[in-house]
Amino acid sequence: GFSTTFMTVAARLSPPSASVRIRILFTVVRAVSADEKYAEAGAVMVDTAEEIYGTCDFVAKVKEFEPSEYGLLREGQIVFTCIHPAAHPEEVQALLDQKVIAFTAEDSHRYGSPNCEAAGKQGALMGLDSMLTIHGGKGKFVSGLGAAPGMKVLILGGGVVGQAALAVLHALGAWVTVADINIGTLRSLQNQYRQNINTMIANRENIRQILPETDMVLNCVKWPKGNTQYLITREMVRTMEPGSVIVDISNDEQGALETFHETTHENPRYVEEGV
């Protein structure tokens, strides 16, 4: 007896899943790319975010709300997305001001969201691609060749994203170190991988010591917005070998990496201090 509308902005909802949700509860409105299979399943395609926020009672998306979206939210609207309230107090205030009912996707269950797993795995693969000399990398082979050692990789953060990246890189033969602030997480990963990975507490001094010998860094840390006590400073990046790779999966402005700036799919790489 419950009727509402449901929208996905960036999450990949499969056509069968869309069909099931339509039959049970919802009319699905999707605002990414048009797909006949979604239409066949009963999804409604729209062209603008304004249409979505203006008509949907339940809004689900992947990333945090952008400031341009704050004014589109309506009182009583239910929203479900990654909010990361500790890192985005201004977003929390906007949700309170608009009087919406908000659920933090990242805290909805202990196993995290599939998009976090996808980001970790794809980030690892993008890092390996960037290591190729044709992309400016040092050309080191992930698992090593003959008498040549494999890549040394540092993963910042042992959460869902970091664990997904670790699964890919360990399977391919990389020498991986995971840094996290939770010793319980590190112990669990050590046991899971039968002591075949290195772990350490994530702080600047520990990272500084191993960075010169590290071939690739993956940042999987959600950093408090505005905190400029970077885990990796520009000066630390200078200690890495030219052609080394940093993959910032967290993608936070003023995040854990001082040298971060946004990129596009068309031009995803840039060079800072030779890295």
Model-derived regions: residue spans:
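Glycine-rich phosphate/diphosphate-binding loop of Rossmann-like nucleotide-binding domains
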Residues: G1, R23, T27-E36, I134-N219
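An N-terminal-biased, well-structured beta-alpha scaffold segment characteristic
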Residues: G1, R23-A94
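Short amphipathic, helix-prone segments within low-complexity/disordered or flexible regions
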Residues: F2, F6-V20, I24-V28
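A structured beta-alpha segment of the ubiquitous adenosine-cofactor-binding alpha/beta core
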Residues: G42-D57, E64-F65, T199-V217, V221-R238
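Rossmann-fold NAD(P) dinucleotide-binding segment
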Residues: K61-A86, P212-E213, G226-I246
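Glycine/serine-rich phosphate-binding loop and adjoining beta1-alpha1 elements at the start
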Residues: F65-M151
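Rossmann-fold NAD(P)-binding glycine/threonine-rich loop
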Residues: A86-D107, E235-V275
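Short glycine/serine/threonine-rich phosphate/pyrophosphate-binding segments
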Residues: V160-L166, G184-L186, K225-L231, Q254-L257
